Amino acid sequence: MPKIKTVRGAAKRFKKTASGGFKRKRANLRHILTKKSTKRKRHLRPKGMVSKGDLGLVVACLPYA
């Protein structure tokens, strides 16, 4: 049986936690930052967790994580 390929884009975006969840970076903090308030940018800084509804998709993309 051949090995399952990991989706490389997903491997760069998600990190598995010890409890089995996945950490992710929040969107909207790359460019066009001048019109966004300091508060909004500050709240986008901490890492988020992948939601339960999307967890199956991430697990399918990362078979060896």
UniProtKB/Swiss-Prot annotation:
Pfam families: Ribosomal_L35p. GO terms for cellular component: cytosolic large ribosomal subunit. Keywords: Ribonucleoprotein, Ribosomal protein. InterPro entries: Ribosomal_bL35 (IPR001706), Ribosomal_bL35-like (IPR021137), Ribosomal_bL35_CS (IPR018265), Ribosomal_bL35_sf (IPR037229). One of its GO terms (molecular function) is structural constituent of ribosome. One of its GO terms (biological process) is translation. HAMAP family: Ribosomal_bL35 (MF_00514). Belongs to the bacterial ribosomal protein bL35 family. This is Large ribosomal subunit protein bL35. It comes from Photorhabdus laumondii subsp. laumondii (strain DSM 15139 / CIP 105565 / TT01) (Photorhabdus luminescens subsp. laumondii). The lineage of its organism: Bacteria, Pseudomonadati, Pseudomonadota, Gammaproteobacteria, Enterobacterales.
